Design a protein with these regions (language model features):
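Substrate-binding pocket helix/loop in short-chain dehydrogenase/reductase
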Residues: 113-115, 119-124
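SDR active-site lid
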Residues: 190-253
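Conserved glycine-rich Rossmann-like NAD(P)H-binding loop of the short-chain dehydrogenase/reductase
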Residues: 45-60
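The beta1-alpha1 cofactor-binding region of Rossmann-like NAD(H)/NADP(H)-dependent oxidoreductases
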Residues: 55-56, 76-87, 120
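Conserved glycine-rich cofactor-binding loop
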Residues: 29-30
């Protein structure tokens, strides 16, 4: 485990409850996590501790932050290993660092496939990164966070936890587990720790790099663009939701459709969503619908 530290600075801005707080963000090297790091620092004067595995990307983030890099430090480790979280907690405690907010954002999206085509190794890896990393982080961090007067935990789940579609069995299961656990922990620590749950829909980040998009048709591309949310907007929505201390945050056109559809129409929403994907012939779902 490696830690690169920078001097903490200050900035002037309108106060909100997490201004100038110390925030831990996992999955900080790209996508939503990277966006959160930059916004929390630039707009709220937060001191951010980023966690990721890719040192090259973390160094690039430091460069992007420019003179704001003094607000940033990072640790390099695999969030799916519980011992890494123990070492992390021990290290920041020994350094006298008091974190206020933990944002569990790290996650992976397995290639869309039929359940029977996943190996047990694929399944275990998805559950470890998407679910157990949250378990391990909160297990060691909650006692530390309770020492803060502005304690908060934000777990990033997915719209897949709201409505499962064909090809996402493992991903949906891992994110649904995060959702259920978060909702329970919220009640257990109500009044002591703000606990927020984020269920983002399709977001234009590199989490889809495992998916084989192939040569999508114009209709398919337009459909993806129509339901996808830019990373910048998603980050803005999440930070705004945290500012308002929202309990459940469902962001993105597709996520809201899946959430509302499940509430009013139950499992029919999963059936309709899967049927639409099948009919538009998205290449990234070819192993789900167009192979044995």
């Amino acid at each position: 485990m490696f830690c690169k530290k920078f001097k903490i600075g200050e900035c002037d801005m309108v106060n909100c409850w997490f201004d100038y707080k110390t925030v831990i963000v996992s999955g900080a090297s790209s996508g939503i996590g990277k966006g959160l790091v930059k916004k929390l620092i630039a707009d709220h004067g937060c001191t951010v501790i980023g966690i990721a595995r890719n040192e090259k990307r973390m160094k690039a983030l430091v460069e992007e932050l420019g003179d704001k890099a003094r607000y940033f430090s990072y640790y390099l480790f695999d969030v799916s290993e519980k011992e890494n979280w123990r070492n992390f907690a021990k290290d920041i405690t020994e350094k006298g660092i008091q974190p206020d907010i933990l944002i569990n954002n790290a996650g992976i999206l397995p290639k869309f496939n039929k359940f029977g085509h996943y190996s047990l190794e694929n399944i275990d890896r998805a559950m470890q990164v998407n679910f157990y990393s949250n378990v391990y982080s909160m297990n060691v961090m909650i006692p530390i966070l309770l020492k803060s007067k502005s304690a908060g935990i934000v777990n990033v789940s997915s719209s897949a936890a709201l409505c499962s579609i064909a090809g996402t069995s493992i991903y949906s299961a891992s994110k649904a587990a995060v959702k259920s656990m978060t909702e329970s922990i919220r009640e257990e620590y109500r009044g002591r720790i703000y606990v927020g749950l984020v269920c983002p829909g399709f977001t234009k980040t590199d989490i889809f790099h495992n998916q084989d998009k192939g040569q999508e048709s114009d209709i398919s591309e337009k459909m993806l663009d129509m339901v996808s949310t830019s990373c910048e907007k998603m980050v803005n929505d999440i930070v705004n939701g945290i500012w308002k201390k929202k309990s459940n945050m469902v962001f993105g056109i597709d996520a809201r459709m899946m959430n509302d559809g499940t509430r009013f129409f139950g499992v029919l929403t999963s059936k309709i969503s899967s049927s639409v994907i099948r009919k538009v012939h998205l290449d990234m779902f070819k192993d789900v619908f167009y192979s044995e």
